[in-house]
Amino acid sequence: MSELRKRNQAAIADLSENIEVTETVELTEKKPETTKSTKGHIIDLIICVSGIYASFLTWAVLQERIATTPYGPDNKIFRASLVINTVQSFLAAAVGYAYLQYKQSRRAAKGLKKNTTVFDSMYTLKQLSLVALSQSLASPLSYTALKYVDYLTSILAKSCKLIPLMALQVTLYRRKFPAYKYAVVVLVTIGVSMFTIFHAAPKKASGAGSEHQLYGLGLLGISMLLDGLTNSTQDQIFRKNADITGPHVMCGLNLLTGVFTTVSLLTFSRPQLDTAIAFIRLHPEIMRDIVLFGLCGAVGQVFIFQTLEKFGSVVLVTVNVTRKMFSMLLSVVWFNHRLTLGQWAGVAAVFGGIGFEAWMKMKKN
């Protein structure tokens, strides 16, 4: 039962991993700005990051409840993670559209152009479809990989998401980054990896034989590439269309993801849908937790896509990969927990990378 709960919890955690993504003081890759404008960007970044972190805390509570709490006298646990993902996608699409209407109404009130069309061109539709497809495939691959690789390998892979992201931006979309940006990415990746290595207790995967580990590593690698494709393509959408905002992408992406996962539930994953319907009939209270989980995810996505629109995917992914480390640092302060020497070295590497980027940005401005 503990193994089942661990897998189910990992699967639901991947739902937030897909939409989430992170924190550095690199504000944008646009032209140098005035000090006043830079301060405004810092405030915006703090608000976005605080919103993302707060939403993760709420997600964690509801995730724990759905993944581990037995429902009813028969003590059944809900295992239909794809159903949860589908509900969350449609709820986030609705919240995104409401937020889009609000932001565009404010633009119109200022005499600016109003654009409430989510798919304003075939290019936008194609790019969002690509993102939705890659995002929908990445989570199941990552979850399946847990059967063949150990826990430490899995979380180390998640710590290295910045590398495939930048690699795809350079090779696929011909983006150019200053040399210091590569150094920052390496420092942050090494720091988070060290923090993970010197903390995680080894946990065996259910199928962790040597003959299966190569297969599991392959699944993890494909999942990381799909994550990189998701985030780099989102960046490209904003760069190619000045009228596209965070709410546009949030609404369109979640709508398409919901459609894809619904098709999957009606075809390849029909047994999961049937099981979920039967479970909900017996334990209707599960719907309350699923809807609350979806709404919390939708609110979190408002901050996520605001970060993506204003600061880019590199910042967003950095927030994601450093989130666990900052959470543990808070526990050190509040509960007097102790970190190992290796973990402190990892923290120093992360803050060194962030501080170096901040210094380069101020020097540039």
UniProtKB/Swiss-Prot annotation:
Keyword Transmembrane helix found: yes
Transmembrane segments annotated in the record for this chain: 42-62, 80-100, 182-202, 206-226, 249-269, 289-309, 315-335, 339-359
Annotated InterPro entries: SCL35B1-4/HUT1
Assigned keywords, A-Z: Endoplasmic reticulum, Glycoprotein, Membrane, Sugar transport, Transmembrane, Transmembrane helix, Transport
Glycosylation site residues: 115, 231
An annotated Gene Ontology molecular function: UDP-galactose transmembrane transporter activity
Domain of life: Eukaryota
Keyword Transmembrane set for record: yes
Protein topology in the membrane: Multi-pass membrane protein
A Gene Ontology BP annotation from the UniProt entry: UDP-galactose transmembrane transport
GO cellular component terms listed in the entry, alphabetical order: endoplasmic reticulum membrane; Golgi membrane
SUPFAM superfamilies listed in its UniProt record: Multidrug resistance efflux transporter EmrE (SSF103481)
Subcellular location: Endoplasmic reticulum membrane
Role played: May be involved in specific transport of UDP-Gal from the cytosol to the Golgi lumen. Involved in the maintenance of optimal conditions for the folding of secretory pathway proteins in the endoplasmic reticulum.
The family this protein is said to belong to: Belongs to the nucleotide-sugar transporter family. SLC35B subfamily.
Name the UniProt record assigns to this protein: UDP-galactose transporter homolog 1
